[in-house]
Regions:
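Metal-dependent enolase-superfamily TIM-barrel catalytic cores that perform enediolate-based chemistry
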Residues: 46-163
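Catalytic alpha/beta core domains of metabolic enzymes, predominantly
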Residues: 151-244
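Flexible C-terminal active-site loop/helix
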Residues: 221-282
Length: 282
């Protein structure tokens, strides 16, 4: 069947019938939206009726030793206009190791005047999560993401009561229907196109979150400028941005979204604006 004869929503429905994985379909969905915007000779954000992003992105630091933090933070921010740092916690060595690392991040980030946020990647149990949220609330942390493991969503209710920081979910929210189950137990959701199956479902996730009065975030996995540019193209109304993985790729096989005054900005061109720099690398 000619792709022109089918809408993106029809192709999405077919992919679900065929049980195509979210990550695989995300690549196709992004390509379809890019094609549709190019056909209209419009930037993708404009085709979708969205503004260009204005919210500054965070850069991310993984679980590491305090000594590594001392080197890593300046490496990230000495020549960057980013103003937020996301710290991965949930160390297998326990919350004492998390505290030691966070304290070093707090110290090392002072010269850059950064906003700090924490992603526990589901690495805490309910008791430790409650303790860490209280501890972090006294140490300049803006919010905590995915404090509990995927599958432990019912325990979010206990954690949400009397929380001292906003709670976001990431792995616990893949599709828009997930939000309905625990919208009363979280403050926000983190959308990732590779996790949700691309732009089509991603827009549903954002709309559903906003309908329930939740804050929105968009993040990424280890992705190139292709999918980051697509994510940046839909981030104009999103509250928190975490689109930084392409800055770490050496080399990035594509070119597109760049940091402009701390904002991960899509290249303004028809489509999502990204292109392969050398197809032989793929």
């Amino acid at each position: 069947t000619n792709i022109n004869d089918k809408s993106i929503s029809e192709i999405e429905s077919l992919s679900r019938e065929l049980k195509i994985s979210a990550g695989s379909y995300a690549g196709l969905d992004i390509a379809l939206w890019d094609w549709k915007a190019k056909k209209a000779n419009m930037p993708l954000h404009a085709l979708l009726g969205l503004p260009i992003p204005k919210t500054k992105t965070s850069l991310t630091i993984g679980i590491m030793s305090p000594e590594s933090v001392i080197d890593r933070v300046p490496l990230l921010f000495d020549n960057s206009t980013a103003k937020y740092l996301k710290i991965k916690l949930g160390s297998p060595e326990g919350i004492d190791a998390d505290k030691i690392m966070y304290e070093q991040v707090l110290e090392s980030s002072k010269p850059y005047n950064l906003g700090l946020r924490v992603d526990a990647n589901g690495g805490w149990n309910t008791e430790n999560a409650k303790h860490m949220i209280e501890w972090l609330s006294k140490r300049q942390c803006d919010y905590v993401e995915q404090p509990l493991a995927q599958g432990k969503e019912k325990d979010l209710k206990t954690l949400y009561e009397n929380r001292l920081l906003p709670i976001f979910v990431d792995e616990s929210c893949r599709y828009s229907q997930d939000i309905i189950e625990y919208s009363q137990w979280v403050d926000g959701v983190n959308l990732k196109l590779m996790k949700s199956g691309g732009i089509t479902e991603g827009l549903r996730v954002l709309a559903t979150a906003k309908a329930f009065g939740l804050e929105t975030m968009i993040g990424c996995m280890s992705e190139s400028s292709i999918s980051i540019s697509a994510a940046a193209s839909i981030s104009g109304h999103i509250d928190h941005i975490d689109l930084d993985s392409h800055y770490n790729l050496k080399p990035d096989p594509a070119s597109g979204a760049k940091m402009v005054n701390g904002v991960t900005m899509p290249r303004i061109a028809p489509g999502h604006g990204a292109f392969l720099t050398n197809e032989n690398q793929i």
